[in-house]
């Protein structure tokens, strides 16, 4: 029988994957907004102090929804994001490293809360300073189109490094952790750092965008058939993308020789995003002799919730070993 803590862990893991299956959710009601927040000291900062770039044609209004009817008011997802942000969770015992965490949502929404959750809390318990990113979505009319989420990710990792001194971590020990479609955003951040996705706006944009390591959990990786996740591919590239577009946004096809070490975790029984996404990226790293660690669990589904214990997700323990390993 699952303990209460493992049930909470399962909900959090499924939340990180939310949007891949896209179950219905209800708008936040006034009484929900009035309920106490679970937030305990998380700082929230806008990514773009003067507004996100390229929004002249954006008309959709940002929404916050509950992921389940009458559920936890902090278990939310964002749609039509116009003002992306970073929420910061500080560890009690810092280990000198930071993680930029990118949740999923099938590129149709972002399953994230300003209150944080058990995953960022678990990473902080391991000593990481954790930055949780909310990001813009490609179908909302932004000028950058399918690169809009990459713009936010590049800006976010620069903002993370800009906080290194005052938060007490090494700017050369900044990893990215992405989940589901957020894994695709993280994968692009880890492979497309040789070009700026946006024009610099301040001195922060002089900082590098290459993460020092990347963890991709049950990730969307490829846009190529037969393993592309249809929901993410359609939201990212439209209903009739060309072969060239599919190729351009397939992470495994654009690995630079100086890609950071990659950690991949997926379940063989994932019926939402095929584990072959992770296999394709591992094989591509193997061809180039790039550092990459792959874990395929027999069971776990999309979210790897079934391979969690009362002590936390199995992938988190393995990721911690990977990120703290001497290289």
Which residue ranges define each predicted feature?
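Mobile cap/lid helix-loop segments that gate and shape the active-site cleft of serine hydrolases
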Residues: 65-73, 203, 219-254, 260, ...
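Catalytic nucleophile-loop/oxyanion-hole region of alpha/beta-hydrolase
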Residues: 110-119, 133-170, 307-314
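Short beta-strand/loop motif that positions the catalytic acidic residue
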Residues: 264-266
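C-terminal catalytic histidine-bearing segment of alpha/beta-hydrolase fold enzymes
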Residues: 279-327
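Conserved alpha/beta-hydrolase "acid-adjacent" motif
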Residues: 272-277
């Amino acid at each position: 029988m699952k303990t209460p803590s493992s049930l909470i862990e399962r909900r959090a893991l499924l939340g990180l994957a939310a949007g891949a299956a896209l179950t219905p959710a209800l708008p936040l009601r006034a009484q929900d907004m009035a309920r106490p927040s679970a937030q305990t000291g998380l700082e929230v900062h806008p990514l773009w102090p003067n507004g996100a770039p390229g929004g002249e044609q954006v008309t959709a209004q940002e929404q916050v929804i509950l992921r389940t009817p009458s559920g936890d008011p902090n278990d939310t997802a964002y749609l039509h994001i116009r003002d992306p942000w970073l929420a910061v969770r500080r560890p009690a015992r810092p280990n000198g490293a930071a993680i930029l965490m990118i949740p999923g949502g099938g590129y149709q929404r972002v399953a994230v809360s300003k209150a944080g959750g058990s995953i960022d809390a678990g990473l902080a318990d391991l000593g990481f300073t954790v930055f949780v990113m909310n990001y813009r979505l490609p179908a909302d009319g932004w000028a950058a189109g399918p690169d809009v989420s990459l713009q936010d990710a590049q800006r976010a990792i620069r903002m993370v490094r800009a906080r290194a001194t005052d938060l007490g971590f090494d700017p050369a020990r900044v990893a990215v952790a992405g989940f589901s479609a957020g894994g695709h955003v993280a994968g692009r951040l880890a492979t497309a750092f040789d070009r700026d996705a946006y024009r610099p706006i301040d001195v922060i944009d002089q900082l590098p965008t290459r993460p020092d390591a990347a963890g991709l959990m049950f990730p969307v990786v490829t846009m190529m058939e037969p393993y592309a996740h249809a929901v993410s591919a359609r939201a990212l590239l439209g209903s009739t993308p060309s072969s060239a577009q599919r190729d351009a946004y397939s992470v495994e096809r654009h690995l630079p020789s100086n890609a950071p070490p990659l950690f991949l975790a997926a379940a063989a029984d994932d019926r939402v995003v095929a584990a072959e996404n992770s296999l394709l990226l591992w094989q591509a790293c193997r061809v180039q002799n790039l550092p990459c660690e792959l874990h395929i669990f027999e069971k776990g589904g999309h979210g790897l919730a079934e391979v969690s214990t009362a002590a936390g997700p199995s992938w988190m323990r393995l990721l911690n070993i990977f990120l703290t390993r001497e290289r």
